[in-house]
């Protein structure tokens, strides 16, 4: 990423470890103006085209352009009892609660086991980058949850 993008992104050392989601949202949220949003979107798109393996650019673009999709996901989650429970309780799947070894101990057909297998297969970590530019705490949680559990359904 270029110097301008790094200034706007203001990387944080925090991850989704510990604390409740409200605390994490307040700690990581970076308010930006509409002009900054457009500029950061364009810059991230250019950086993403120059380096397609840069997940930071993809994450940034997602946060800046997915408001409508996040609202639809929130509506979809609220349409089922399990989804409403998840939205209400805001559980996080992160290294403060689980290790990959813990996930692999879950039953074969469980989300935990499949997630552990996915992380192991692709040599990934449990923690995901915090959401920084979504200005709604509820929608930021939906995106956080999406990042945590929607990685190709752990094929």
Swiss-Prot record:
It comes from Cryptosporidium hominis. Pathway: Cofactor biosynthesis; ubiquinone biosynthesis. Its cofactor is Zn(2+). This is Ubiquinone biosynthesis protein COQ4 homolog, mitochondrial. It is an enzyme of class 4 (lyase). Lyase that catalyzes the C1-decarboxylation of 4-hydroxy-3-methoxy-5-(all-trans-polyprenyl)benzoic acid into 2-methoxy-6-(all-trans-polyprenyl)phenol during ubiquinone biosynthesis. It is a peripheral membrane protein. Its main location: mitochondrion. It is found in: Mitochondrion inner membrane. Belongs to the COQ4 family. InterPro entries: Coq4 (IPR007715). The keyword Cell inner membrane does not apply. PANTHER family: UBIQUINONE BIOSYNTHESIS PROTEIN (PTHR12922), UBIQUINONE BIOSYNTHESIS PROTEIN COQ4 HOMOLOG, MITOCHONDRIAL (PTHR12922:SF7). Component of a multi-subunit COQ enzyme complex. Its EC number is 4.1.1.130. Pfam families: Coq4 (PF05019). It catalyses: a 4-hydroxy-3-methoxy-5-(all-trans-polyprenyl)benzoate + H(+) = a 2-methoxy-6-(all-trans-polyprenyl)phenol + CO2.
